[in-house]
Amino acid sequence: MFINRWLFSTNHKDIGTLYMIFGAWAGMVGTGLSILIRAELGQPGSLLGDDQIYNVVVTAHAFVMIFFMVMPIMIGGFGNWLVPLMIGAPDMAFPRMNNMSFWLLPPSFLLLLSSSMVEAGAGTGWTVYPPLAGNLAHAGASVDLTIFSLHLAGVSSILGAINFITTIINMKPPAITQYQTPLFVWSVMITAVLLLLSLPVLAAGITMLLTDRNLNTTFFDPAGGGDPILYQHLFWFFGHPEVYILILPGFGMISHIVTYYSGKKEPFGYMGMVWAMMSIGFLGFIVWAHHMFTVGMDVDTRAYFTSATMIIAIPTGVKVFSWLATLHGGNIKWSPAMLWALGFIFLFTIGGLTGIVLSNSSLDIVLHDTYYVVAHFHYVLSMGAVFAIMGGFVHWFPLFTGYTLNDTWAKIHFTIMFVGVNMTFFPQHFLGLAGMPRRYSDYPDAYTTWNTISSMGSFISLTAVILMVFIIWEALASKRVVKSIPLTSTNLEWMHGCPPPFHTFEEPAFIKSSIK
């Protein structure tokens, strides 16, 4: 029974739960790695050993957080749980493929972990640039194992993307159009399209790297007529859409949370929100070379990528101001989920502003590969994606489990996390402006003060992570059941009670639409 339910599952709720548990576990691994990084950088001098082991930790931290924490939780966990409920579908379009998408992840994770245990590990950074990732600078199996890990994670995501696109397009009730589906459903569909279009390019790039390393090809080796810059183009054509893949489902969740706790029936500017997400998805594909301003592109190319990158700020601004407009005049309930959403809006906006700074190719020449970039993307990921995940988790926890969290503990947890991440990443802007480069395990004494503060902040965040484990335990142990959830036209996922039955919408849903 246990094996049939959890190993061979074809139920979107169970698979969503598996994704959540896997993502939470991977998140702890990733947090542990980040603590190692900050412990090393907490003061000058060496802690872990040489820079190779340090860079292996940095690389693993990035891969674990991106491919095994944020994506499985947002797309696999929340996506699987909520999309069928929100559109009134009995399950996903391809339930067995859904199961395979999940079970490709543990082997992928295993390959990534084993890559750090053989030879010297893959100390390439998550970008895996040749020639550093070639078979001279990284002899041995480490990088090959990392590449295979990425292949598996990529196949998992592509299959999941196909599944979500098919589900969302084909499994809505006949009465509703795509423009009547909730914003979270939209965000997952756009994310799935981005995955489907970008991951094959990554697969091509890392497969060429694999053959360069093992089969004597020279795709990225100038000695044989190749070009390492080609790899960078292929990688970032995936890598930039990837960062939007990480944040778009968060946009969808934040829209739901802000609407719900403002006491509104619908988010402000629904069509504008949809348009903004589609624009971000499209523009995300034509700005990739802003990661490569230092490789010697000519001035016209840099001018284009600077302008195109700045244009993304417009749809992003539409979203931020629409969230603020949704709040406006509302009867605001200061629940923990609302705090996460407000924290998201504030900190994501700061991250966006530093992104606008970095989009200037001339400035980026100076700031590229400094801690300013690290601060920028951790503001949008560690405080954008993670805050959205936390907000979504505390908001939908009663739906997933049938139990309520302790409000006071949840608010304390938010406060500790908020202080921790800001103390960790705000000083890194100063380090970057002062010229401290990324991916080094040591630094001149002049950088000590801000690094020490940053490392203290990371330990505060660690206590928040540990407290969250306690909060979830407390909720599951106390078993406070949900009384009732006020239903509006925009939160139909609660319709079947908390938690919903194993099978929902076994008969096709009938939607009586009053939208003109």
Swiss-Prot record:
Q: Which residues lie on this side of the membrane: Mitochondrial matrix?
A: 1-11, 87-94, 171-182, 262-269, 328-335, 401-406, 479-516
Provide the residue positions that the database annotates as binding Cu cation: 240, 290-291
**Membrane topology annotation:** Multi-pass membrane protein
Q: What are the GO cellular component annotations? A: mitochondrial inner membrane; respiratory chain complex IV
Q: Which GO terms describe its biological process?
A: electron transport coupled proton transport; mitochondrial electron transport, cytochrome c to oxygen
Mitochondrial intermembrane side stretches: 41-50, 118-140, 213-227, 287-298, 358-370, 434-446
- Report residues of the 1'-histidyl-3'-tyrosine (His-Tyr) crosslink: 240-244
Note the superkingdom of the native organism.
Eukaryota
Q: Where does Fe(II)-heme a bind?
A: 61, 378
Residues at which O2 binds: 244
Q: Which InterPro entries match?
A: Cyt_c_oxase-like_su1_dom, Cyt_c_oxase-like_su1_sf, Cyt_C_Oxase_1, Cyt_c_Oxase_su1_BS, Cyt_c_oxase_su1_dom
Reaction catalysed by this chain?
A: 4 Fe(II)-[cytochrome c] + O2 + 8 H(+)(in) = 4 Fe(III)-[cytochrome c] + 2 H2O + 4 H(+)(out)
**Signal peptide residues on this chain, from the entry's feature table:** none
Chain sites annotated for binding Na(+): 40, 45, 441
Q: Name one GO molecular function term.
A: cytochrome-c oxidase activity
Q: Where along this sequence does the record place binding of Mg(2+)? A: 368-369
Quaternary organization: Component of the cytochrome c oxidase (complex IV, CIV), a multisubunit enzyme composed of 14 subunits. The complex is composed of a catalytic core of 3 subunits MT-CO1, MT-CO2 and MT-CO3, encoded in the mitochondrial DNA, and 11 supernumerary subunits COX4I, COX5A, COX5B, COX6A, COX6B, COX6C, COX7A, COX7B, COX7C, COX8 and NDUFA4, which are encoded in the nuclear genome.
Hey, which family's this protein in? Belongs to the heme-copper respiratory oxidase family.
Function, as annotated: Component of the cytochrome c oxidase, the last enzyme in the mitochondrial electron transport chain which drives oxidative phosphorylation. The respiratory chain contains 3 multisubunit complexes succinate dehydrogenase (complex II, CII), ubiquinol-cytochrome c oxidoreductase (cytochrome b-c1 complex, complex III, CIII) and cytochrome c oxidase (complex IV, CIV), that cooperate to transfer electrons derived from NADH and succinate to molecular oxygen, creating an electrochemical gradient over the inner membrane that drives transmembrane transport and the ATP synthase.
What's the protein here called? Cytochrome c oxidase subunit 1
Tell me the lineage of the source organism: Eukaryota, Metazoa, Chordata, Craniata, Vertebrata
